[in-house]
């Protein structure tokens, strides 16, 4: 029997407002525990929440960028549950009237485009954070309590772990481009839960779903779903039944582990938040927010192809993150050739960042520095090989590329007279290679070019070297 995989994702994104959603407490990551709190965040008796309008703007902007319909009449509700990270014993969220509904984003996997529906985007407050000690005690930090948060719920349109990965990449890029969140998973500003079920191919009814948690990276989402897909298939093929349960992904063992079995759906006893009136969003408000949405990744990608002549793949990679795309834009504004800038960013820059496990802003490289180096290549001042030495200095220590070339004596040798003398010396020392080349062994030319580069410490102009080698060999 063959099965179809059904996946839905719930993504929580913290909004980077200056203050929290219902209080004036600072909304900044990294403060000492329990210092960014107030009596409102902690639910003291008699205090009242005041809605942060900027958080509403940000939620609307995110919803619009995800092609959602924006509600005209929306409200907040109390989601009741008891847990140590929830000091009020309820969370202010949205139940039946979310701020955005019926959205979608388009992903591409294996060269095929697919639209993934978004059921809803609603605004709520985040909970505190528990830290579990090895001594059996747990500590709670309420700095995160009351942070404005949007929950983005996808339709069950995702069919493979690879599609889930592509959806998350695209969603993150769109949110980052709007500027409403930095989406840093390592800081908890983007978190994801996944729901997965299997059904026999051709069956309309969904199978029993499993919820996956502890998915701390997009790669873990993909790996967790891959494991769970195989686990459920094995259970069904052996005649077993899938339980409705919550499982966590164990990265060390690359498997999912049972956390708890759900006997029914959670009953949070939602009811309207009595301390907040309904929120009415008129057309003027909607249009003001819509006018603030910047160019989004798909539009920027299309522009790179149509106006800059970049291949579609290059444009896709460059626009995956706003940080990389903005860096590329600034580099070409500094006068660099667009294709060369793209090649360096996708090649040497990404390779360095991946090897060092760094973000681009954590390196010393600047758009002006990269552009300056590229202009030295196009002017013939340095070769592409020498440029790699300059690049290493730029990305590790920064500086002016022209000064680096000057200080390290890296200027490309393009003087024909000087190179012709070195060519003669190389040919005199490698008579066999001349004979091999004349006998049709093209690799001999590559060997001679290598000897020239060795003799000049990589500073010889490679195009001129090829020309002079061929000329001098013809004379012999």
Curated annotation (Swiss-Prot):
Q: Which GO terms describe its molecular function?
A: asparaginyl-tRNA synthase (glutamine-hydrolyzing) activity; ATP binding; glutaminyl-tRNA synthase (glutamine-hydrolyzing) activity
UniProt EC number: 6.3.5.-
| Alphabetized PROSITE patterns for the sequence | GATB (PS01234)
On whether Protein biosynthesis is a keyword of this UniProt record, the answer is yes
From what superkingdom does this record's organism come?
A: Bacteria
List this protein's GO terms for biological process. Answer: glutaminyl-tRNAGln biosynthesis via transamidation; translation
- InterPro entries in alphabetical order: Asn/Gln-tRNA_amidoTrfase_suB/E, Asn/Gln-tRNA_Trfase_suB/E_cat, Asn/Gln_amidotransferase, Asn/Gln_tRNA_amidoTrase-B-like, GatB, GatB_C_1, GatB_Yqey_C_2, Gln-tRNA_amidoTrfase_suB_CS
* Keywords from the UniProt entry: ATP-binding, Ligase, Nucleotide-binding, Protein biosynthesis
ATP-binding as a keyword? yes
Catalyzed chemical reaction(s): L-glutamyl-tRNA(Gln) + L-glutamine + ATP + H2O = L-glutaminyl-tRNA(Gln) + L-glutamate + ADP + phosphate + H(+); L-aspartyl-tRNA(Asn) + L-glutamine + ATP + H2O = L-asparaginyl-tRNA(Asn) + L-glutamate + ADP + phosphate + 2 H(+)
Q: What does this protein do?
A: Allows the formation of correctly charged Asn-tRNA(Asn) or Gln-tRNA(Gln) through the transamidation of misacylated Asp-tRNA(Asn) or Glu-tRNA(Gln) in organisms which lack either or both of asparaginyl-tRNA or glutaminyl-tRNA synthetases. The reaction takes place in the presence of glutamine and ATP through an activated phospho-Asp-tRNA(Asn) or phospho-Glu-tRNA(Gln).
Record-stated family: Belongs to the GatB/GatE family. GatB subfamily.
Subunit record text: Heterotrimer of A, B and C subunits.
Protein name from the UniProt record: Aspartyl/glutamyl-tRNA(Asn/Gln) amidotransferase subunit B
**Organism in which the protein naturally occurs:** Shouchella clausii (strain KSM-K16)
């Amino acid at each position: 029997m063959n099965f179809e995989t059904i996946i839905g994702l719930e993504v929580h994104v913290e909004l980077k407002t200056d203050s929290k959603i219902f209080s004036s407490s600072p909304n900044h990551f990294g403060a000492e525990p329990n210092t960014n709190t107030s009596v409102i965040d902690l639910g003291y008796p008699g205090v009242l929440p005041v809605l942060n309008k900027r958080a509403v703007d940000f939620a609307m902007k995110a919803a619009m960028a995800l092609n959602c319909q924006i509600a005209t009449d929306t409200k907040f509700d109390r989601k009741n549950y008891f847990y140590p990270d929830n000091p009020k014993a309820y969370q202010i969220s949205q139940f039946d009237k979310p701020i955005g509904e019926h959205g979608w984003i388009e992903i591409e996997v294996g060269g095929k485009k697919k639209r993934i529906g978004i059921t809803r985007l609603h605004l709520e407050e985040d909970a505190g954070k528990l830290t579990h000690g090895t001594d059996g005690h747990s500590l709670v930090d309420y700095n995160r309590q009351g942070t404005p948060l949007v929950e983005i719920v996808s339709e069950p349109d995702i069919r493979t772990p690879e599609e889930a990965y592509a959806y998350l990449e695209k969603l993150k890029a769109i949110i980052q481009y709007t500027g409403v969140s930095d989406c840093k998973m390592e800081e908890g500003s983007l978190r994801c839960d996944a729901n997965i079920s299997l059904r026999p191919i051709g069956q309309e009814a969904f199978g029993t779903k499993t919820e996956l948690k502890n998915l701390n990276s997009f790669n873990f989402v993909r790996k967790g779903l891959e494991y769970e897909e195989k686990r459920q298939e094995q259970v069904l093929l052996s005649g077993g039944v899938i339980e409705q349960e919550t499982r966590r992904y164990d990265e060390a063992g690359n498997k999912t582990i049972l956390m708890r079995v759900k006997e029914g759906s959670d009953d949070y006893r939602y009811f309207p938040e009595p301390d907040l009136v309904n929120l009415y969003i008129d057309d003027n408000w909607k249009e003001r927010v819509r006018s603030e949405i910047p160019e989004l990744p798909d539009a920027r990608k299309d522009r790179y192809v149509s106006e800059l002549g970049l291949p579609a793949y290059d444009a896709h990679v460059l626009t995956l993150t706003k940080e990389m795309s903005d860096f590329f834009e600034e580099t070409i504004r500094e006068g660099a050739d667009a294709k060369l800038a793209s090649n360096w960013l996708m090649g040497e820059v990404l390779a360095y960042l991946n090897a060092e496990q760094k973000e681009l802003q954590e390196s010393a490289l600047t758009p002006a520095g990269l552009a300056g180096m590229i202009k030295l290549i196009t002017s013939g001042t340095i070769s592409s090989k020498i440029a790699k030495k300059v690049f290493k200095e730029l990305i590790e220590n920064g500086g002016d590329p022209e000064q680096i070339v000057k200080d390290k004596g890296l200027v490309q040798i393009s003087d024909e007279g000087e190179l012709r003398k070195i060519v003669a010396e190389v040919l005199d020392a490698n008579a066999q290679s001349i004979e091999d080349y004349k006998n049709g062994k093209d690799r001999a030319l590559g060997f001679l070019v290598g000897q020239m580069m060795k003799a000049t410490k990589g500073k010889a102009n490679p195009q001129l070297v090829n020309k002079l080698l061929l000329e001098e060999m013809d004379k012999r």
